Amino acid sequence: MSLVQKLAGSKIKLKLEDTMKKYVGLLLMGLMGASPAIADTVKVGYMTTLSGGAGIIGKQMQNAVNIAMEHTGGKLGGMEAEVVFVDDQRKPDVAKQLANRLVKSDKVDVVAGVIWSNLMMAIHKPVTRSDTLLISSNAGPSPIAGAGCHENFVSMSWQNDQTPEGMGKHLQSQGVKSVYIMAPNYQAGKDMLAGFKRHFKGEILAEVYTKLGQTDFQAELSTLRAAKPPATFIFQPGGMGINFVKQWKQAGMDSVSKLYTVFTVDGVSLPALKDTALGVISTQTWSPDLDNAMNKRFVSDYKAAHGAYPSFYAAQAYDTMMAIDHAVGEAGSADAAAMRAVLAKGGIPTTRGPLAMNTNQFPIQNVYLREVVLDNDGVATTKVIGTVFENHKDAYAEECKF
């Protein structure tokens, strides 16, 4: 054999060995699920409403996510991170399409966000059954808290019934005998009124469901005036709440009935309502004046960046990202099973303080009584005036069997 033939043979052998090494390397990376670059990056698909009248809510949530990422140095659990924002347009079919894209095409580790309960119902099965972690920043519909629960779902907000249960208990304790109640006609609206009725034992004079997205409440207010209820309880989030409270005041309804709310008068609506909403009472699991270090930092930085108080939507969006940061850091990876195991243990750092988790992976938390007041600068905000429930659990956890 000539020298040239020997060298050629050696080169062929080396090429074959190199090729085999490459294939073995690719095979190992395939078995591990990703290349090192991808494995070291946590990818979050954040779904919220960024367009239309409800876009004001989604933009606050987006602002809060960005502040959270600033606070974590652009990383989650010490790993490089990427957040993909998507606009669900407040449409269930759009939300479902986006959820499938995030899971199948973008291959996110976590799908988070979601304001509306009907949208959460649309994406819950497609996401959780793909073995992707789904973390709610707001929506907490009752079907997925009970028999329809799934181990890949975690709430960083509340179960829909929890907060209005606080208002029902408060009015019961105040000796109120009868109430007129109202909410939009969708899953969350039904849950809110169910929660209120669970703890209020007096007479329900009327249970009214309005159209989701409704802006004109003159007909409802006229009927309410004729009923002359001593108390009125409403759930009208976002722009619906702004219009309802303005029309309530313009119609002089304060002389007819005392107004009580949940998720209606907050950091979304107060910049528009200003002192119109002074004195309105609500229940909530969060308030900008909660006295803990994380909340103070978040509220201060949000106000500095955006010139207004954050809403509870923003606080929950911030808490969601801090929960992911905590879960990835403790688990050492963005593996869904590892992250949910960390979150299920509780002790999650949030603007509400360390958060405990129920067996259905919804929070166990306080429900506060709040009043709209003016701060030292004359800006309308909410102030905690009492605690209705301590370490409050939702009503559906016992039905949840993972």
Residue ranges of model-derived segments:
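Extracellular/periplasmic Venus flytrap/periplasmic-binding protein
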Residues: 97, 142-145, 150-251, 286-297
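Solvent-exposed, acidic/polar segments of extracytosolic/periplasmic ligand-binding ectodomains
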Residues: 42, 347-402
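Sec/Tat signal peptide C-region and signal peptidase I cleavage site
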Residues: 34-39
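Beta-alpha junction/loop-to-helix N-cap segments that form part of ligand/metal-binding clefts
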Residues: 56-61, 71, 75-144, 156, ...
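Extracellular/periplasmic periplasmic-binding protein-like sensory domains
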Residues: 245-318, 329-334, 382-402
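Venus flytrap/periplasmic-binding-protein-like
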Residues: 88, 135, 142, 212-213, ...
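Extracytoplasmic "Venus flytrap"
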Residues: 45-64, 86-93, 115-116, 182-190, ...
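Periplasmic-binding protein-like
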Residues: 102, 106-115, 135-137, 178-183, ...
